[in-house]
């Protein structure tokens, strides 16, 4: 009786394994980062984006290998090259990834008038000079685009940003937190595309 149970269990587990193995694994690779931040900081954000995609269930290919491939292909590029796909897509095909992700990280400061405090002081008749109501805001934004390697088409894009007053205690969202926000946005479109291809 126990042997029968073991045999049935083994067959059941084997069938489940075969069923799940039919679902192909989706792999993506992030392109070299772009934006207004220092390269070291941008790289930290790209690593966070990769981590967020991995947590969402996708495989993440070696970014440094992709960068090397792109550089090699750029150096070999000649005037008679077939331009049906650009270098990045060719590199993606060489790496056998399904998607390429471009990550742009921008950081900037801007001055804004604190209208809330100004209106409050006006009501109390203690209005100060306009310059005293100027606040400096720091903003960081991640913008990502997901390109399907097979078709060279943009299938998803999204952005997430955080802004803080520089003189106050609240700090900007961490790279991980901001990356999760933007990846959650684009995963909906990626899942739709995967479902469409499998049907």
Q: Where in this protein do the model-derived segments appear?
A:
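Residues that line or immediately flank small-molecule/substrate-binding pockets and catalytic motifs
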Residues: 17, 104-107, 162
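Short, low-complexity, Pro/Ser/Thr/Gly-rich segments in the mature regions of secreted, periplasmic
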Residues: 185-199
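Outer-membrane beta-barrel translocator domains and adjoining extracellular loop/strand segments
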Residues: 114-119
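Short secondary-structure boundary motifs at beta->alpha junctions and helix caps
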Residues: 123-188
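Sec-dependent N-terminal signal peptides
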Residues: 2-14
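Boundary at the C-terminal end of the N-terminal hydrophobic targeting segment
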Residues: 19-23
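N-terminal segment of the mature soluble domain
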Residues: 25, 31-32, 36-109, 149, ...
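Short catalytic/ligand-binding loop motif for oxyanion handling, primarily in non-cytosolic enzymes
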Residues: 109-112, 164-165
């Amino acid at each position: 009786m126990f042997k029968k149970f073991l045999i049935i269990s083994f067959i059941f587990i084997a069938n489940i394994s075969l069923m799940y193995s039919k679902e192909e694994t989706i792999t993506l690779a992030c392109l070299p980062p772009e934006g207004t931040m220092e390269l070291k900081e941008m790289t930290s954000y790209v690593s966070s984006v990769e981590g967020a995609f991995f947590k969402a269930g996708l495989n993440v290919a070696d970014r440094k290998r992709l960068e090397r491939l792109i550089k090699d292909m750029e150096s070999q590029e000649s005037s008679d090259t077939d331009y049906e796909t650009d270098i990045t897509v060719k590199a993606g095909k060489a790496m056998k990834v399904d998607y390429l992700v471009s990550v742009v990280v921008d950081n900037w400061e801007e001055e804004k008038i604190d209208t809330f405090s100004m209106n409050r002081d006006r009501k109390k008749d203690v209005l100060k000079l306009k310059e005293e109501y100027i606040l400096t805001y720091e903003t960081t934004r991640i913008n990502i685009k997901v390109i399907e390697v097979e078709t060279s088409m943009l299938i998803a894009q999204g952005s997430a940003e955080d802004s803080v007053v520089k003189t106050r205690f609240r700090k900007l969202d961490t790279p991980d937190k901001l990356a999760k926000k933007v990846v959650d946005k684009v995963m909906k479109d990626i899942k739709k595309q995967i479902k469409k291809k499998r049907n």
